[in-house]
Design a protein with these regions (language model features):
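A short C-terminal boundary segment appended to hydrolase-like catalytic domains
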Residues: 31-97
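Conserved beta-sheet core of the metallophosphoesterase superfamily
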Residues: 1-38, 44
Length: 97
């Protein structure tokens, strides 16, 4: 889908169902511009995975303009960042019941 969805934990691993449209040229003004960067860090020592639970979610908008898509994604800050994090949390809660 072209919208954010939740993150499910399955057998101790993350399933990220949709990041939304990070950079999307198919619509001049999508109604939902929310997107995210999902970072997953893996630590390998001596060829063995020792840690894989370090994650970071960076809320973004697919446009740096609110009225149209200028095809310049931007990292969100402040209340907009918190709004998107809350949205992801709500979607994720429904998946992890």
């Amino acid at each position: 889908p072209h919208v954010l969805q939740g993150i499910e934990e399955y057998k101790g691993k993350n399933i990220v169902y949709s990041l939304g449209n990070f950079c999307f040229g198919g619509n001049k003004n999508p109604s939902d511009k929310d997107t995210m960067i999902f970072q997953q860090t893996f630590t390998v020592e001596n060829g063995e995975l020792v840690e894989d639970d370090v994650t970071n979610i960076i809320p973004c908008s697919l446009s740096s303009e609110s009225g149209y898509n200028n095809y310049q994604p931007m990292v969100l800050e402040g209340s907009e960042k918190e709004r998107v994090l809350q949205k992801i949390e709500e979607f994720s809660a429904a998946l992890n019941q």
